[in-house]
From Swiss-Prot:
Outcome of gene disruption: RNAi-mediated knockdown results in decreased feeding capacity of the ticks. (Microbial infection) Decreased Bartonella henselae load in ticks during infection.
The UniProt record lists the keyword Cell cycle: no
Record flagged with keyword Translocase: no
GO molecular function terms noted in the UniProt entry: serine-type endopeptidase inhibitor activity
Protein name (database record): Kunitz-type serine protease inhibitor IrSPI
Principal localisation: secreted
Superkingdom classification of source: Eukaryota
Length: 94
């Protein structure tokens, strides 16, 4: 029973850590894309290195590692900077 509980906790921790991006990935620059004529523009969210938080990016048509459909998704995938739950704000250094 104890071994089963340990295994469940271990796999839960691994799944949680694999479900989000590394801080380096979240701090990737957001690519500037040129949209094709008639392309559907949308608002996406990305982690902004200057403000240390997820922010909206209006008029995007591209995709990238640091682009998310919702702010909640951005915060969940990039829990760094002002979104950190550890009690300290990352200074952005790697």
């Amino acid at each position: 029973m104890k071994a089963t509980l340990v295994a469940i906790c271990f796999f839960a921790a691994v799944s949680y850590s694999m479900g989000r991006l590394t801080e380096t990935q979240c701090r990737f620059p957001v690519p500037v894309t040129s949209c094709a004529e008639g392309a559907k523009l949308r608002t996406v969210y990305s982690f902004n290195n200057n403000t240390n938080q997820c922010e909206p990016l209006k008029g995007s048509c591209g995709e990238g590692v640091n682009q998310f459909e919702t702010e909640d998704c951005c915060r969940r995938e990039c829990p760094y900077g002002k979104h950190s739950k550890v009690g300290k704000v990352s200074d952005g250094t790697f």
